[in-house]
């Protein structure tokens, strides 16, 4: 049996143990996942990872080997062990659609069900959503900064091997065009790309020999890496070997803007006017913004994408907001939360998002200008997964929803949150 049950913190199970002993584990409850505040400098977040999370919740089961280990390690009592042997999440999960932009306080994911079941999901929910939403927010900002120029995700080598796959998924969700990660291509259907690294060039007696070898296997449409030794000489060698129909060159070092300008002038002077310029090497949304007037044709982004561009977590929390029919909330300084289950709507006026409205779960907002769009979609009902959109469908949704945000909110500069949140 495939299980995700131990992708959790020990205290989730010790809390369950205490709830069972107190007879409270079946108490009807609601948990909400939200951000108390957005990461510094961010004006909106992007909901990501829910498509991965749903099957992980259905796989949150405890086989005999797992339960025996929990008993041997003195994590749970025998009574709790028996509960876990038959465990299957039976509640409801709803929330923002994958790819949906959000602001602080928005109920991204709501989990309803018996208290003991819901409490077990905390670590798994936060692990998936915090990582993927952080990557998605960075990717969305980079995509806006690129202004239509293709973006390649290249961050697998800068993070954990599985996180690299998930980062590629989140990046493609938010508009990236391809990934270097083959597992992401296989698992998620993302276009893959890649040609050669500096090691390939260094393996041959001369740069020209390396280019010729690459052309023999990849064809003239390939991208030649021209900065192993000297960029100008690399470009000249690339055109000499490949001819003026060479697909692209890649520059991975030096001042990006000036390097692209010099490369374009040189390529044009050599007759390679259609050869594209791909820039890589420590790019982020700020550098890409500065390159808006540079003659670059595409960007490859690695480290800054796979680490959330300096914001490696979305800062989401998973809090009990209702139990036994009454709202509950923390009130400690700096972490006071509104209690009660809620749902969200977005007001869109003349094609432009105007505000987020969050109300108690049973209420709908009053009328007003424009369209009131419900933001909550079902993910599981009675423990059974709902039909989920494809990743391509979620990508289309994200691009459409992001395009409705105020234009100044899409700039990389810090500023107020993209939308005001009204709570009632």
Regions found by a protein language model. Give the residues of each.
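Glycine-rich phosphate/ribose-binding loops and adjacent secondary-structure elements
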Residues: 199-352
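Ordered alpha/beta subdomains of enzyme catalytic regions
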Residues: 1-217, 320-424
């Amino acid at each position: 049996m495939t299980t995700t049950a131990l992708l959790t913190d020990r205290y989730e199970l010790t809390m369950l143990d205490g709830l069972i002993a107190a007879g409270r584990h079946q108490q009807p409850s609601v948990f909400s996942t939200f951000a108390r505040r957005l990461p510094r400098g961010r004006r909106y977040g992007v909901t990501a990872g829910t498509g991965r999370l749903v099957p992980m919740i259905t796989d949150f089961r405890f086989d005999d080997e797992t339960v025996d280990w929990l008993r041997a390690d003195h994590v749970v009592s025998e009574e709790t062990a028996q509960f876990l042997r038959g465990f299957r999440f039976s509640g409801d999960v709803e929330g923002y659609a994958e790819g949906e932009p959000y602001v602080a306080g928005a109920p991204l994911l709501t989990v309803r069900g018996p208290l003991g079941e819901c409490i077990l999901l905390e670590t798994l929910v936060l692990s998936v959503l915090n990582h993927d939403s952080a990557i998605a927010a960075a990717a969305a900002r980079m995509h806006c900064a690129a202004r239509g120029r293709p973006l390649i995700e290249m961050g697998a080598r800068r993070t954990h091997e599985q996180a690299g796959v998930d980062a590629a998924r989140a990046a493609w969700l938010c508009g990236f065009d391809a990934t270097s990660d083959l597992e992401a291509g296989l698992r998620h259907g993302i276009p893959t790309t890649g040609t050669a690294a500096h090691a390939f060039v260094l393996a041959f007696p001369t740069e020209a020999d390396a280019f010729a070898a690459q052309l023999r296997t990849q064809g003239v449409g390939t991208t030649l890496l021209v900065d192993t030794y000297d960029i100008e000489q690399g470009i000249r060698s690339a055109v000499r070997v490949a001819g003026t129909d060479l697909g692209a060159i890649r520059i991975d070092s030096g001042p990006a803007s000036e390097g692209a300008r010099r490369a374009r002038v040189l390529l044009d002077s050599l007759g390679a006017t259609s050869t594209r310029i791909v820039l890589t090497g420590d790019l982020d949304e700020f550098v890409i913004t500065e390159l808006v007037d540079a003659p670059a044709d595409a960007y490859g982004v690695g480290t800054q994408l796979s680490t959330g561009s300096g914001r490696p977590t979305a800062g989401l929390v998973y809090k009990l907001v209702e139990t036994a029919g009454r709202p509950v909330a923390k009130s400690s300084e700096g972490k006071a939360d509104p209690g009660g289950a809620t749902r969200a709507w977005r007001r869109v006026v003349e094609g432009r998002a105007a505000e987020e409205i969050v109300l108690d779960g049973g209420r709908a907002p009053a009328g007003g200008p424009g369209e009131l769009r419900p933001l909550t979609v079902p993910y599981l009902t009675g423990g059974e997964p709902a039909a989920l959109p494809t990743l391509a469908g979620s990508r289309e949704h994200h691009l459409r929803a992001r395009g409705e945000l105020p234009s100044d909110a899409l700039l990389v500069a810090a500023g107020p949150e993209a939308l005001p949140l009204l709570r009632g």
